[in-house]
Swiss-Prot record:
GO cellular component: a single term: cytosol
Keywords for this protein: 4Fe-4S, Cytoplasm, Iron, Iron-sulfur, Metal-binding, Pyridine nucleotide biosynthesis, Transferase
Species assigned in the record: Burkholderia cenocepacia (strain HI2424)
Protein name: Quinolinate synthase
Subcellular locations according to the entry: Cytoplasm
Similarity field: Belongs to the quinolinate synthase family. Type 1 subfamily.
Family annotation (Gene3D superfamilies): NadA-like
Record-listed E.C. numbers: 2.5.1.72
Domain of life assignment: Bacteria
Gene field: nadA
Annotated positions binding iminosuccinate: 59, 80, 151-153, 168, 238-240, 255
The reaction(s) this protein catalyses: iminosuccinate + dihydroxyacetone phosphate = quinolinate + phosphate + 2 H2O + H(+)
Residues annotated for [4Fe-4S] cluster binding in this entry: 125, 212, 309
Top-rank EC class of the record's enzyme: transferase
Amino acid sequence: MQSTIKPVEYDRPVAAGTVCGVGQAWAKVPDAPSAEERAALKARIKALLAREKAVLVAHYYVDAELQELADETGGCVADSLEMARFGRDHDAQTLIVAGVRFMGETAKILSPNKRILMPDLDATCSLDLGCPVDEFSAFCDAHPDRTVVVYANTSAAVKARADWMVTSSIGLEIVADLHARGEKIIWAPDRHLGSYIQKKTGADMLLWQGSCLVHDEFKGIELDLLRAEYPDAKVLVHPESPENVVAQADVVGSTTQLIDAAVKFDAKRFIVATDLGILHKMQLAAPGKTFIAAPTAGNSATCKSCAHCPWMAMNGLANLADVLERGHNEIFVDPAIGERARLPIDRMLEFAAAHKKRVQASGDLQRDQSLFANVGAA
């Protein structure tokens, strides 16, 4: 069962001082520094991280040079929830989040007493943009009999309206559990991930009609042609992709799952349907293997993302150094919203911990593998 909410056009005109649309995001992407500038910026950032007693946490989708810097300085390169957990558990009182705004907010929710800084506060997410809290709250109010489940890629205010927050590592299990208890569900914001979970679980779900700008552009017909060109390649697909792309996957999962698959599969060649930023970590984890980007457009089409998130691309060495030097671009979350938003996050974490214990206690490796066959970390 799906909602009839009209999908959001992310390249619509955006008023100054509100949110950053696709065109504005690409306009704000920093120019690539020269080799000399890059070396100087990295040295400066390392010194500033030490001076500020700060730690850098970066998402798999930001540019390789930022991922390298996080690894080199004792930081973290991970999925969005692991970024927040790492920041929560680290001794540093200042976290530099290289990613998009909802990631900074999630870090602040889990570490309310820490200072959270971001290279550019305009770095947002099409899923977040496409799920305004006022509209979403009205939608929830219109269906009071349903349990509200939201994906991690949402604002703090939307999380505060939810009963559960999920990542793709545990979303199937949580929805299946809710379905087994007879609960009907509102799902937001990604319609493709929601549809994937709905088909796997058979749950009664109303799907908010949001989508990821990057994953929504992957094309099933062109992917089929690419597979014919490389018949030996395994296909790795993020579940935020359209159904006709997911259907061609050898592995469906998100960032951590897809990296693990690249390591564990015996294949030497992979077609990857997710943000190009992940290829850096895949190449490090599986040297000697070849990774091919899945097609985002046909010959006569143009792409808005070309398989790289424009908001992720707004993170660069220069603005990272600047935020450390000036101490600006701090993330704030209203304490009342933060407290409410933490409840669905903690509920998910508790469920995940209990679920992990149940799986480990089963002692059945074949059963365990089937449980995790098509899911990965958020």
